[in-house]
Amino acid sequence: MNIKTLEIADKKLSVTAEFKPVMHLSGKTIFRYEVLAKIYNASDRWLPVEQSFDILARETIQAISDFLFETVCELLKMKEGITVSFKLPAQLMNDMAYLASLYQQCGDHHVAPQRIEIEVGEWLTDTPQMHRQAFLQQARTYGFMLSLEDFGTRKESADSLRMFRFDTIKLARTLVCGIAASPAKLSTLHNLIDKVIPAGTHVICEGVERSSDLALLSRYSHIGIEGYMFSRPLTFSQLRLLEDF
């Protein structure tokens, strides 16, 4: 179910789906999974996804995205109570027809879009405001949750966050990792959570991999955390064992 082979200029790429658990800081319970693509070439060499997406043709990127979304829908059909975060590639952002096709897949699989969170990146700030606002509004109209990743890597505006009304803000790994050794990082993180991110928005800290950093996040019992300290991404088989289905 979770392996796809793509032909690109007579060369083969194998793509598999993995699932990164997102934990509640209080209780350390899993409340969401993030689906990830893992790409290998014909020599079984692993290729970094972000670098691969920079050089792959749009058709190939869409094929990988389609495969991941299909995997998410199949998973949600098998297990009630799970929600999954799905990262939309930058190359497909603002493509209304593609967004409509994702919504159609939910209908074909009888899966509620409300169980899927579409994650967009910081490149959103480089897109004309009218286009990005219309795209995100349409995604919300379809019922999808919305998430912004890598937050905190540039000057942020509370007003823009309120305008786009993200359900979840993911604080960048580069900001979170090492806060115990960097008072400046820690101060920035506190400012973003306490003053910039709108109240009621879910906050997830990426890259929590040190106990010293985790201890400083303990004041925020409501936030979510990701990182190898808790779990590496899971294969579909490992996820089935963990969730018992």
Task: Describe the function of each predicted region.
Residues 85-87, 117-120:
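Extended hydrophobic secondary-structure segments that form protein cores and membrane-embedded regions
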Residues 94-107, 127-135, 155-168:
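Distinct, well-ordered alpha-helical segments
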Residues 72, 102, 135, 192-194:
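Aromatic/hydrophobic pocket-lining residues that form π-stacking "cages" and hydrophobic walls in ligand
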